[in-house]
Regions:
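Bacterial N-terminal signal peptides
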Residues: 1-10
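Phosphate-group recognition and catalysis centered on beta-loop-alpha active-site segments
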Residues: 11-299
Length: 299
């Protein structure tokens, strides 16, 4: 935590949102398998301002769009590679897992990433980040999350440097970047947020929070100004600790709550559209992450 006390110059010259903003959580993931090109394509069609990608890394160092560090939840890896599992202990019990970082891109491309969601999506593949960029570029912004960076460091993989190279390779930062495709990086890792700022990554950084309020005062929160440009937090934290929104805005930082889903609407709202409208217009948050981009309230 001491590293965050270092005063740094702001890495982004302007706020990351120009209006109340719709971020498609893993694409239009209520209607298509998360983190697939099908989900990203549908989110674009539904008018999303930004498309979120969760990023993991293959054994041969390629950024792929995948939420979990392992492959078994959203692919048929256990069927295609039944003997390539690692054994981990969860709640005192051994469990098989197929870590993405143990497989090459070519091997991962053999997997079906759609059938788990619906048979109509059979044959969808795990996309690379570059493939996601190619689809989204010029149509919406990119909202990648750097997943489990500490695990990758233990495996000799520098996720921040891979992200930096991807931004340059796809011309996503600097004067030649396409203004129609802004990029916002997000991470739960405080250390990663600091390292990205130290790299002068050149795009806004959002630090993600969990259900617990880490800031007992506005002064503690303001220590992040100049390192990150905003916070992402559970929508429940926005309501139970409303001072976070006030402190963030008073510090020039944005707030983006997650995740708005039709099947997980908080009590007191008629539907997910009503819920998002309350957060955006009444509470004054800057953006929302939702699985259902088509339910975003009219602005």
């Amino acid at each position: 935590m001491a590293a965050v006390l270092v005063v740094m110059a702001s890495i982004a010259g302007s706020a990351q949102y120009s209006k109340k903003t719709l971020v498609a959580h893993r694409g239009a993931s209520a209607y298509a398998p998360e983190n697939t090109l099908a989900a990203y394509r549908l989110a674009i069609e539904m008018g999303a301002d930004f498309i979120e990608q969760d990023l993991e890394v293959t054994r041969d160092g390629v950024l792929i769009c995948l939420h979990d560090a392992s492959l078994e939840r959203t692919t048929n890896v256990a069927k295609v590679f039944p003997d390539r599992f690692a054994t981990i202990v969860v709640d005192g019990k051994p469990r098989k897992t197929w870590l993405a970082n143990d497989f090459t891109l070519a091997e991962i491309k053999r997997l079906d990433a759609g059938s788990w969601f619906n048979a109509s999506f059979a044959g969808e593949r795990v996309p690379t980040f570059d493939e996601a960029v190619a689809l989204v570029k010029g149509k919406a912004g990119l909202y990648p999350e750097l997943k489990t960076p500490e695990m990758y460091l233990l495996r000799g993989v520098n996720l921040e440097r891979l992200m930096e190279a991807a931004l340059d390779r796809n011309v996503l930062r600097g004067p030649k970047a396409d203004r129609r495709t802004p990029v916002i990086l997000q991470t739960f890792s405080q250390n990663t947020a600091v390292r990205l700022a130290q790299l002068k990554i050149g795009v806004p950084i959002v630090l993600l929070l969990d259900d617990n309020n880490p800031f007992e005062s506005i002064d503690r929160l303001r220590q992040w100004k100049g390192i990150v440009q905003g916070f992402g937090m559970p929508k429940s934290l926005v309501t139970k600790a409303p001072q976070l929104l006030n402190w963030s805005h008073a510090s020039g930082l944005t707030v983006t709550p997650y995740t708005f889903r039709p099947d997980a609407v908080q009590p007191g709202f008629t539907d997910v559209t009503d819920e998002m409208e309350f957060f955006l217009k009444k509470l004054g948050v800057d953006a929302v992450l939702t699985d259902s981009p088509d339910r975003f309230p009219q602005q």
